[in-house]
Amino acid sequence: MTNSKQINLLKIVLGIVQLLLILLFTWAGVMKLLFPGELPWLWAKENPDLVAVTGVVDLVAGLGLLLPLLPHISSKLTLYAAYGISVLMLAAGLFHILRGESDQIGFNLFVLVCALFLAWGKRKALHQIKK
């Protein structure tokens, strides 16, 4: 595979990951803010204030990934949102471990890897633009 094909493939994969994270965090934010009683997780029923806070954070994360797709909005916002999602997933994993729910962190780890991959790819792209 030539270098330009690899770069194009990387851009496609990064775009798919970004889109999936946008959908995930926008959905999670809307569900936590508008329908908190319908959430299936035990922790959500025990911590309604935390559900509201994480709902806002999730929605901001989704918007932080979505807005840079619009014209005249810096793609650095994607990088910052991906870093923020990484911190959020680390905190969520720690939260579950402290609650004795370490079997629940697989999804958090998957999202963490996706966010770090997106941050790596966007950082790499931003450095190439500067050259």
Predicted feature residues:
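Membrane-interface extramembranous regions
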Residues: 2-131
